[in-house]
Amino acid sequence: MVPQKTLLSRVFLYITIPKSFYLTYYIDQFYFKKNKIWMFKLMGAYTFNKSVINFDGLKFIKLLGTGSKDGFSVIPDFSSYVMITSWENDDFRKKFIDENKLFQEIIIKSSKRIEIKIDPYNYIGTWNGVNPFKNKSSYKEGKIIVLTRARVRLNKLINFFISTSSAAKSINSRKGADYYKGVGELPIIEQATISIWKSEQSMKDYAYSNKSHLKIIHKARKDKWYSEELFVRSNIISSKEFK
């Protein structure tokens, strides 16, 4: 159960987790052909917060919107949303799906849901002051999913968007990238990306050899674009599609 006193706007955490404790993590992607405005209004709404804040076994939850096109547009993609969660174990996750009425309503109103179970093995940085990824794991051969998240400083917003547009285009055409989408909690300011790669090596080939990407990394550090950053690599344990 997540203590209410730790709720800070869109943050639902945190308790002390023993180092030996192993959590389960999921990324749910929801797609809408109808009910788009209903889902958009749910973003950051008190109704959603109240529905999930005291659910047993829940350690972390974020409901994220997405940007149109490649995800870096200031115009939202009203047809696509992402939810990231961590649980004490899969039994609590199953109970949430079976019993949480608001989550069930989201499923019913959506046209498709993709459930990805992940195993984080490399992570650095924080999300609202805390890193929710606690497992001690290692890379397994196969596809990986990468999450990057940053809070952009207000006085760096224009520079950020001008510079990142070229990188977004380059990653979409990069060999080894199966999927890429810009997501976020707060339009423009709190930015994140989710990408799926055929292997860890294919991700590294892009990250460490693509000139556009390297240029942006250097510029971000030099100009101090971000007040907070998080980078996570995860094994993909399973991926299921529900319609």
Q: Predicted regions span which residues?
A:
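Extended hydrophobic/aromatic segments used for targeting, binding, or gating
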Residues: 205, 211-228
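A common structural junction motif
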Residues: 101-108, 214-215
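Short S/T/G/P-rich N-terminal loop/turn motif that feeds into the first structured element of a domain
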Residues: 1-81, 90-96, 108-192, 202-209, ...
